Amino acid sequence: MMPIAEILRVYPGVGDSGFRALVDAFYRRVEADPLLRPIFPADLTQGRERQYLFLRQYFGGPAEYSERYGDPQLPRRHRPFPITREARDVWVTHMFAAIEEVGIPEPHASVMREYFERFSLAMINQSDEPSSPTFEPSRAHIPARLIDTINQ
Protein backbone atom coordinates (compact mmCIF):
# COMPACT_ATOMS: atom_id res chain seq x y z
CA MET A 1 0.00 0.00 0.00
CA MET A 2 1.32 3.41 -0.97
CA PRO A 3 1.76 6.01 1.75
CA ILE A 4 -0.86 8.76 1.59
CA ALA A 5 1.85 11.38 1.07
CA GLU A 6 2.94 9.65 -2.17
CA ILE A 7 -0.65 9.47 -3.42
CA LEU A 8 -1.19 13.17 -2.76
CA ARG A 9 2.01 14.10 -4.65
CA VAL A 10 0.64 12.73 -7.92
CA TYR A 11 -1.59 15.70 -8.77
CA PRO A 12 1.17 18.31 -8.42
CA GLY A 13 3.41 16.12 -10.60
CA VAL A 14 0.81 15.36 -13.28
CA GLY A 15 -1.40 18.46 -13.27
CA ASP A 16 -4.79 19.13 -14.79
CA SER A 17 -3.59 18.63 -18.35
CA GLY A 18 -2.02 15.28 -17.48
CA PHE A 19 -5.20 14.00 -15.87
CA ARG A 20 -7.30 15.27 -18.78
CA ALA A 21 -4.97 13.53 -21.26
CA LEU A 22 -5.06 10.32 -19.21
CA VAL A 23 -8.86 10.21 -19.17
CA ASP A 24 -9.05 11.00 -22.90
CA ALA A 25 -6.54 8.25 -23.75
CA PHE A 26 -8.38 5.78 -21.53
CA TYR A 27 -11.81 6.56 -23.01
CA ARG A 28 -10.49 6.22 -26.59
CA ARG A 29 -9.61 2.64 -25.67
CA VAL A 30 -12.98 2.03 -24.00
CA GLU A 31 -14.82 3.31 -27.08
CA ALA A 32 -13.03 0.74 -29.23
CA ASP A 33 -13.28 -2.19 -26.82
CA PRO A 34 -16.02 -4.76 -27.57
CA LEU A 35 -16.17 -5.99 -23.96
CA LEU A 36 -16.15 -2.64 -22.15
CA ARG A 37 -18.04 -0.37 -24.54
CA PRO A 38 -21.47 -1.95 -23.86
CA ILE A 39 -20.99 -1.47 -20.11
CA PHE A 40 -20.64 2.29 -20.50
CA PRO A 41 -23.47 4.72 -21.35
CA ALA A 42 -23.96 5.69 -25.01
CA ASP A 43 -22.77 9.22 -24.27
CA LEU A 44 -19.39 9.10 -22.56
CA THR A 45 -19.18 12.84 -21.89
CA GLN A 46 -20.39 12.75 -18.29
CA GLY A 47 -18.32 9.68 -17.45
CA ARG A 48 -15.18 11.31 -18.80
CA GLU A 49 -15.74 14.42 -16.73
CA ARG A 50 -16.54 12.49 -13.56
CA GLN A 51 -13.49 10.27 -13.94
CA TYR A 52 -11.28 13.30 -14.54
CA LEU A 53 -12.62 15.10 -11.46
CA PHE A 54 -12.41 11.99 -9.29
CA LEU A 55 -8.85 11.06 -10.27
CA ARG A 56 -7.66 14.62 -9.89
CA GLN A 57 -9.18 14.78 -6.39
CA TYR A 58 -8.03 11.34 -5.26
CA PHE A 59 -4.44 12.04 -6.23
CA GLY A 60 -4.23 15.35 -4.37
CA GLY A 61 -6.02 17.90 -6.53
CA PRO A 62 -9.05 20.10 -5.89
CA ALA A 63 -12.05 18.46 -4.18
CA GLU A 64 -14.38 19.41 -7.03
CA TYR A 65 -15.68 15.86 -7.48
CA SER A 66 -16.95 15.69 -3.89
CA GLU A 67 -18.32 19.23 -4.07
CA ARG A 68 -20.39 18.33 -7.13
CA TYR A 69 -21.29 14.69 -6.51
CA GLY A 70 -20.69 13.94 -2.84
CA ASP A 71 -18.81 10.98 -1.42
CA PRO A 72 -17.34 8.94 -4.28
CA GLN A 73 -18.55 5.56 -2.92
CA LEU A 74 -17.18 3.93 -6.07
CA PRO A 75 -18.44 0.37 -5.49
CA ARG A 76 -21.98 1.69 -4.97
CA ARG A 77 -21.79 4.00 -7.99
CA HIS A 78 -20.60 1.12 -10.19
CA ARG A 79 -23.17 -1.39 -8.92
CA PRO A 80 -25.63 -0.82 -11.81
CA PHE A 81 -22.97 -1.86 -14.34
CA PRO A 82 -22.14 -5.56 -14.85
CA ILE A 83 -18.44 -5.73 -14.03
CA THR A 84 -16.79 -9.16 -14.19
CA ARG A 85 -13.18 -10.01 -13.38
CA GLU A 86 -12.50 -10.12 -17.11
CA ALA A 87 -13.99 -6.64 -17.62
CA ARG A 88 -11.99 -5.34 -14.66
CA ASP A 89 -8.79 -6.81 -16.10
CA VAL A 90 -9.44 -5.21 -19.49
CA TRP A 91 -10.25 -1.90 -17.76
CA VAL A 92 -6.92 -2.02 -15.90
CA THR A 93 -5.04 -2.91 -19.10
CA HIS A 94 -6.51 0.13 -20.85
CA MET A 95 -5.75 2.41 -17.92
CA PHE A 96 -2.15 1.21 -17.75
CA ALA A 97 -1.79 1.73 -21.52
CA ALA A 98 -3.21 5.25 -21.14
CA ILE A 99 -0.65 6.00 -18.40
CA GLU A 100 2.10 4.92 -20.80
CA GLU A 101 0.65 6.78 -23.79
CA VAL A 102 0.36 10.03 -21.87
CA GLY A 103 3.82 9.63 -20.39
CA ILE A 104 2.91 10.01 -16.72
CA PRO A 105 6.33 10.30 -15.07
CA GLU A 106 7.67 8.14 -12.27
CA PRO A 107 7.09 7.80 -9.40
CA HIS A 108 3.56 9.01 -10.16
CA ALA A 109 2.88 6.32 -12.78
CA SER A 110 3.70 3.57 -10.28
CA VAL A 111 1.50 5.13 -7.61
CA MET A 112 -1.39 5.33 -10.08
CA ARG A 113 -0.90 1.77 -11.34
CA GLU A 114 -0.90 0.41 -7.79
CA TYR A 115 -4.12 2.27 -6.99
CA PHE A 116 -5.88 1.09 -10.17
CA GLU A 117 -4.70 -2.50 -9.70
CA ARG A 118 -5.94 -2.71 -6.12
CA PHE A 119 -9.06 -0.59 -6.05
CA SER A 120 -10.50 -1.89 -9.33
CA LEU A 121 -11.04 -5.23 -7.60
CA ALA A 122 -13.79 -3.61 -5.52
CA MET A 123 -15.72 -2.79 -8.70
CA ILE A 124 -16.26 -6.45 -9.62
CA ASN A 125 -19.93 -7.22 -9.04
CA GLN A 126 -20.58 -10.18 -11.34
CA SER A 127 -19.01 -13.57 -11.79
CA ASP A 128 -17.32 -14.45 -15.07
CA GLU A 129 -19.19 -17.76 -14.88
CA PRO A 130 -22.51 -17.49 -16.75
CA SER A 131 -24.20 -19.94 -14.38
CA SER A 132 -22.94 -18.30 -11.19
CA PRO A 133 -25.20 -15.90 -9.34
CA THR A 134 -24.35 -12.24 -9.14
CA PHE A 135 -22.39 -11.48 -6.05
CA GLU A 136 -21.89 -8.34 -4.04
CA PRO A 137 -18.27 -7.88 -2.99
CA SER A 138 -17.72 -6.46 0.45
CA ARG A 139 -15.22 -3.81 1.28
CA ALA A 140 -13.47 -6.34 3.52
CA HIS A 141 -10.79 -7.05 0.93
CA ILE A 142 -10.00 -3.35 0.48
CA PRO A 143 -7.41 -2.04 2.92
CA ALA A 144 -9.10 0.22 5.50
CA ARG A 145 -6.48 2.88 4.88
CA LEU A 146 -7.51 3.08 1.22
CA ILE A 147 -11.20 3.28 2.11
CA ASP A 148 -10.49 6.10 4.57
CA THR A 149 -8.50 7.97 1.93
CA ILE A 150 -11.21 7.61 -0.69
CA ASN A 151 -13.94 8.68 1.72
CA GLN A 152 -12.09 11.87 2.70
Model regions: which residues?
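Core of compact, soluble alpha-helical bundle domains
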Residues: M1-Q152
